[in-house]
């Protein structure tokens, strides 16, 4: 009688093959090969030809002279005046530049994500978690040449894994100019575009070849919700167009073997109390129209801020709390509804603790 049955022999053969693989690679990798790339990664802006870089510079200045960077389409000459965002064309207003450890693990890694928090925004979210710098100009002004110097400091002194532009929708031309200047000076880490997804297609086109990782936050679905909570009734149309364009440029999120993201789209959705159904619609649209392999972060850290819960006057003149329906933390049941809908729609790559003891890719 044979020592092992044919079935057991096949199982043991597969096990031995896996052990051999692990011994050669010295780590357990839990990801499909399409999402793994070799290090070192060469950022997209380092691959631009001198001619393409010159075209980017020219287009950047043209956008500032007739601003159409976001769907508000102010069309103002920002060298002479300002539009909805209140930021001129000669500089950017920056609140903080520093290694940041509050991002997704695949972005912050060990040394942090080199975050540049811009002041100002093209939305007016009533629940804004950073309203103190987003709803007004609060920071210091930097010309593109000065911003470029800071990007290099994030790389050399901070040893950051990437440069992370936070709320940059209204300063895209200045960002492009700064990255191109820094590239000539030795910048070589990926660029993260951390956006509310209220971008114009012209803006995303200008960023093509500059940005490595798009980090959009798709906030709400219904026009009435966007009008009430974001003060931008056309938010959904703009977000759908811009997210699809981002994915067309860089594809699904890919990593080096150390678990650090290098290129692709990582989409966020902050679940708002009472609006989980809109999160469900967003997940269904993403799976059907963008990619089932899209990396998604369903976020649960909503907290009443900005105008939510502030005292106001009702229709009859009685004192009441503004936006009382979202004046509470989000419930985990609401978050779970969105996550389950995402899985049912076909999405499977999530930012959450790994079930297998490794890291989720």
Residue positions per predicted region:
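Auxiliary Fe-S-binding modules of radical SAM enzymes
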Residues: 2-81, 251-361
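Short, catalytically relevant binding-site loops at active-site mouths
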Residues: 197-201, 220-223, 232, 272-274
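Hydrophobic faces of well-ordered beta-strands that scaffold small-molecule active sites
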Residues: 114, 163, 191-193, 214-216, ...
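Non-cysteine beta-strand/loop elements that form the S-adenosyl-L-methionine
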Residues: 208-225, 293-302
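A cross-domain feature marking catalytic cores of carbohydrate-active enzymes
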Residues: 118, 167-169, 193-197, 218, ...
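Conserved Radical SAM active-site core
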Residues: 85-209, 213, 223
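Conserved non-cysteine loop/helix-boundary elements of the Radical SAM core domain that shape
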Residues: 133-146, 167-174, 225-249, 274-280, ...
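Alpha-helix-loop-beta-strand connector modules within alpha/beta enzyme cores
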Residues: 178-190, 241-249, 332-338
